UniProtKB/Swiss-Prot annotation:
<comment type="subunit">
    <text>Part of the 30S ribosomal subunit. Contacts proteins S9 and S11.</text>
</comment>
<dbReference type="GO" id="GO:0019843">
    <property type="term" value="F:rRNA binding"/>
</dbReference>
<dbReference type="GO" id="GO:0000028">
    <property type="term" value="P:ribosomal small subunit assembly"/>
</dbReference>
<dbReference type="GO" id="GO:0003735">
    <property type="term" value="F:structural constituent of ribosome"/>
</dbReference>
<dbReference type="GO" id="GO:0022627">
    <property type="term" value="C:cytosolic small ribosomal subunit"/>
</dbReference>
<dbReference type="InterPro" id="IPR036823">
    <property type="entry name" value="Ribosomal_uS7_dom_sf"/>
</dbReference>
<dbReference type="GO" id="GO:0006412">
    <property type="term" value="P:translation"/>
</dbReference>
<dbReference type="GO" id="GO:0005840">
    <property type="term" value="C:ribosome"/>
</dbReference>
<dbReference type="InterPro" id="IPR005717">
    <property type="entry name" value="Ribosomal_uS7_bac/org-type"/>
</dbReference>
<dbReference type="GO" id="GO:0000049">
    <property type="term" value="F:tRNA binding"/>
</dbReference>
<dbReference type="InterPro" id="IPR000235">
    <property type="entry name" value="Ribosomal_uS7"/>
</dbReference>
<keyword id="KW-0694">RNA-binding</keyword>
<keyword id="KW-0820">tRNA-binding</keyword>
<dbReference type="InterPro" id="IPR023798">
    <property type="entry name" value="Ribosomal_uS7_dom"/>
</dbReference>
<keyword id="KW-0689">Ribosomal protein</keyword>
<comment type="function">
    <text>One of the primary rRNA binding proteins, it binds directly to 16S rRNA where it nucleates assembly of the head domain of the 30S subunit. Is located at the subunit interface close to the decoding center, probably blocks exit of the E-site tRNA.</text>
</comment>
<keyword id="KW-0699">rRNA-binding</keyword>
Length: 156
């Protein structure tokens, strides 16, 4: 175990265009090799595509998509008496957001569209409509937690 104190959480500044911390966190998640400008243009371009496709505010569509992706339950391994049990636990709010963003970007990168901007826009639209691989990932996580409900009394 580390002897040092836990590092304090840093505040994320809201992005200049949408004034949202969630969008800033998405940009940080998309960013590779410290290229924030490139990541920002990808995210803002995807938001423009979403606005054109739906006619609604892109931020609202994104927030709906995030609500559909973020897990409520997950399983954690717990060793009891020589065997490992998958124990279902509730996901803390901060971790919910982190997992949602991570799944969204990871799955968008795996999509087949030509540019990352297209992939991200399509995945956000799919998630907002409760379809797509990111929502499936959440459902699988919930299904796993439900299947292991019998071990919920091992919660710590």
């Amino acid at each position: 175990m580390s002897r040092k104190n836990r590092a304090p959480k840093r505040d994320v500044l809201p992005d200049p265009l949408y004034n949202s911390q969630l969008v800033t966190r998405l940009i940080n998640r998309v960013m590779l090799d410290g290229k924030r400008g490139t990541a920002a243009s990808i995210v803002y371009g995807a938001f423009e595509q979403i606005k054109e496709a739906t006619g609604n505010d892109a931020l609202e569509v994104f927030e709906t998509a995030m609500e559909n992706i973020m897990p409520v339950l997950e399983v954690r391994a717990r060793r009891v008496g020589g065997s490992n049990y998958q124990v279902p636990v509730e996901v803390r709010p901060e971790r919910r957001t982190t997992l949602g963003l991570r799944w969204l970007v990871t799955i968008a990168r795996l999509r087949g569209e030509h540019t990352m901007q297209d992939r991200l826009a399509k995945e956000i639209l799919d998630a907002a409509n409760n379809t797509g691989a990111a929502v499936k990932k959440r459902e699988d996580t919930h299904r796993m937690a439900e299947a292991n409900r019998a071990f919920a009394h091992f919660r710590w």
